[in-house]
């Protein structure tokens, strides 16, 4: 089976050098995911030759950087022979348009002694006897012919990809991953922008928490373009014991600040240049403008919050699409360690608590469990 793969539109807008780099990364990611066949680049698209397997279709639909793709049949059209194209179109499309209202879409790259309109008209005439009629505006079925120099490609399906950028072109980011609904979606969105996530989980729920986090990451791994996901699991119970020393209403913000501090150390250790969270503005008390300011105060790495403007319904909808929702919904809200958390914590108060707690963030990270998925 031959598949034509169309990269995301924004890749075509890059400089020639960046475009080559992005397309090269996309090709490598496809190789890692499909694990078979032959792939090559040609005039703004990629071609993939694989065994006839529907599994490949499903896997390609989760590779970021792909706008769409189509299984195709092809012929060499020597000497600009339009008759060859018409005959092949009848062979490929006669059954597809049978008893249906159809349209023909054609486009060309290269020099030919006929136009795209000629192809549409002549192929349409040849297929008309098999059909129920032609309607260019609202057909029941569309058939496509793409002529690239001396090769013509025939297809009738355009399968959508997830678009975005190939995973790996934007470096790495440390993701604070609770395993709730939000953090897997934030991870997915950063992968969509070409980033490889390094996962940091504070385990506050023992083996159950660990189990569901691993299941969620197994789902996200299918979207990673073949890149392995590295997971650091920190024993959050020890941190909670420390936090019991401070005022109860400040504990949620302080817990988040501890997570940021450990994430900062992980960035140092893994040579990562950013931190990502699943926070959404004003969704909960720790995510008010004031508390976000306090939480990230003094952190030296940029903090990305891809869900900052999303409401919960939008996040849930994405989680269902990704496939993580069925696991996230089973997890308790482990980070909700106070029922009366403040919506506006004073920075000076938090910094004083931080000094008194004297948490060794390096040691917290050193004692983490590391898993590669």
Curated annotation (Swiss-Prot):
SMART domains in the cross-refs: THUMP (SM00981)
Q: Catalysed reaction per UniProt?
A: [ThiI sulfur-carrier protein]-S-sulfanyl-L-cysteine + a uridine in tRNA + 2 reduced [2Fe-2S]-[ferredoxin] + ATP + H(+) = [ThiI sulfur-carrier protein]-L-cysteine + a 4-thiouridine in tRNA + 2 oxidized [2Fe-2S]-[ferredoxin] + AMP + diphosphate; [ThiS sulfur-carrier protein]-C-terminal Gly-Gly-AMP + S-sulfanyl-L-cysteinyl-[cysteine desulfurase] + AH2 = [ThiS sulfur-carrier protein]-C-terminal-Gly-aminoethanethioate + L-cysteinyl-[cysteine desulfurase] + A + AMP + 2 H(+)
Give UniProt keywords alphabetically: ATP-binding, Cytoplasm, Nucleotide-binding, RNA-binding, Thiamine biosynthesis, Transferase, tRNA-binding
| Residue stretches making up the THUMP domain | 54-158
| Record-annotated membrane-spanning stretches | none
- Give the pathway annotation: Cofactor biosynthesis; thiamine diphosphate biosynthesis
Q: Where in the cell is it found?
A: Cytoplasm
**Biological processes, Gene Ontology terms:** thiamine biosynthetic process; thiamine diphosphate biosynthetic process; thiazole biosynthetic process; tRNA 4-thiouridine biosynthesis
Q: What is its EC number?
A: 2.8.1.4
Report the principal subcellular site: cytoplasm
Highest taxon, organism lineage: Archaea
| UniProt family annotation | Belongs to the ThiI family.
Q: What does this protein do?
A: Catalyzes the ATP-dependent transfer of a sulfur to tRNA to produce 4-thiouridine in position 8 of tRNAs, which functions as a near-UV photosensor. Also catalyzes the transfer of sulfur to the sulfur carrier protein ThiS, forming ThiS-thiocarboxylate. This is a step in the synthesis of thiazole, in the thiamine biosynthesis pathway. The sulfur is donated as persulfide by IscS.
Mind telling me what this protein is named? Probable tRNA sulfurtransferase
**Which organism is this entry from?**
Saccharolobus islandicus (strain M.16.27)
Q: What does UniProt list as this organism's lineage?
A: Archaea, Thermoproteota, Thermoprotei, Sulfolobales, Sulfolobaceae
């Amino acid at each position: 089976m031959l598949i034509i793969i169309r990269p995301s539109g924004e890749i075509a807008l890059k400089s020639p050098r960046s475009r080559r780099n992005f397309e090269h990364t996309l090709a490598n990611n496809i190789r890692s995911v499909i694990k078979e066949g032959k792939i090559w680049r040609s005039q703004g698209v990629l071609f993939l030759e694989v065994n006839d397997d529907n599994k490949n279709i499903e896997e390609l639909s989760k590779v970021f950087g792909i706008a769409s793709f189509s299984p195709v049949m092809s012929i060499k059209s020597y000497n600009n022979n339009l008759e060859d194209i018409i005959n092949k179109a009848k062979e490929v499309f006669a059954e597809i348009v049978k008893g249906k209202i159809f349209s023909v879409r054609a486009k060309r790259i290269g020099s030919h002694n006929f136009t795209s309109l000629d192809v549409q008209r002549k192929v349409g005439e040849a297929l008309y006897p098999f059909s129920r009629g032609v309607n260019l505006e609202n057909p029941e079925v569309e058939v496509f012919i793409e002529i690239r120099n001396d090769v013509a490609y025939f297809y009738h399906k355009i399968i959508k990809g997830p678009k975005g950028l190939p995973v790996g072109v934007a470096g790495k980011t440390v993701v604070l991953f609770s395993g709730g609904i939000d953090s897997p979606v934030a991870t997915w969105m950063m992968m969509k922008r070409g980033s490889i996530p390094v996962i940091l989980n504070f385990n506050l729920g023992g083996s159950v928490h660990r189990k569901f986090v691993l299941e969620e990451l197994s789902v996200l791994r299918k979207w990673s373009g073949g890149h392995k996901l590295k997971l650091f699991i920190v024993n959050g119970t020890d941190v909670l014991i420390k936090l019991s020393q401070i005022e109860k209403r400040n504990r949620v913000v302080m817990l988040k600040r501890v997570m940021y501090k450990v994430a900062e150390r992980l960035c140092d250790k893994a040579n990562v240049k950013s931190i990502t969270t699943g926070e959404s503005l004003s969704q909960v008390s720790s995510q008010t403008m004031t508390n976000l300011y306090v939480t990230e105060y003094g952190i030296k790495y940029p903090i990305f919050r891809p869900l900052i403007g999303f409401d919960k319904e939008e996040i849930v909808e994405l989680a269902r699409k990704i496939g993580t929702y069925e696991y996230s919904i089973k997890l308790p809200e482990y980070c909700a360690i106070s029922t009366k958390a403040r919506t506006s914590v004073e920075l000076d108060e938090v910094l004083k608590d931080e000094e008194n707690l004297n948490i060794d963030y390096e040691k917290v990270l050193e004692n983490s469990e590391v898993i590669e998925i």
